[in-house]
Amino acid sequence: MKNAVVKFLAALAFVILVSGVANAAGEAQRRWERMNQIRQEKFDLVLPEVMRENKVDMWITVSREGHDDPLTEDFGKGYVGSYGYYIFTDRGEERIERAVLGIGTALVEDNGAYDIMTESFDLREFVEERDPQFIALNYAEHIGAADGLSHTSYQKLARDLGKKYADRFVSAEKLTSDFRSRRVASEIAAFAWAGEMSRNIAERAFSNEVITPGKTTLADVAWWMREQQFEINLGTSFGMPSVYITGPDGFVALSNDHVIQRGDFLAIDWGVGYLNFYTDMKRHAYVLKEGETHLPDSIQKA
């Protein structure tokens, strides 16, 4: 009988473990599929428009092992052994040609967004065949997310393509900004979900669920918020949430061991990351004093 019970418990544990793995894989796959949908819509609807508006007929994004470009998530990731390239070329047709050179994994192939996928290529030959007049690269003076090309990678591109094409390099700063900022329907839906998660966690943080006046610290609230992000696999926009007490003279304390008291006016400034979207949200709360049932007039009319 004892052995039967042990076997039953072992089988139950196995079922629970398998079920847990299946659920986790389900969410991972859903996110991958959602990014694929977004990528397809962006490539179909936004990419031709922004390349032509910016008078660019080739856009090269370099991916290097250990050094991902900020746009890698947008373009589909994949394994890079040394150097890999996402190359978009306007060849005069309605659809922009999309190529992935030197970037592997079945996920890149299965996302269905690319016309050309190979790990065996001659970069100069590829570019010469298309003979672009303006080659946009990801270097930028003002926008960090458009400045993913390292100096070393820039030099390598110039050597590999030769002076003729190196003289045609232009910044992709405006192109990147336009591509990222023009949202398609699937992006708006995904961003709305990220915003709702951000709002929900922030408002729970400023409630009796988390805060006990005279006991809970600002750091306690901030760490609780971070824990919620980990539980549902959300990234962070700014690292540790900024949870602070504020007043007429500005910040009194910020995400530290300051104990929250009745009468404190609290604020949160934070954001979550979901897919390649990052929120930026603020919330405020007042901790009622003993006997208070409403916000003081001074706060309501602030």
Regions found by a protein language model. Give the residues of each.
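Bacterial N-terminal signal peptides
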Residues: 9-20
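Active-site neighborhoods and metal-handling regions in enzymes and metal-associated proteins
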Residues: 25-302
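Bacterial N-terminal signal peptides that target proteins for export
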Residues: 1-10
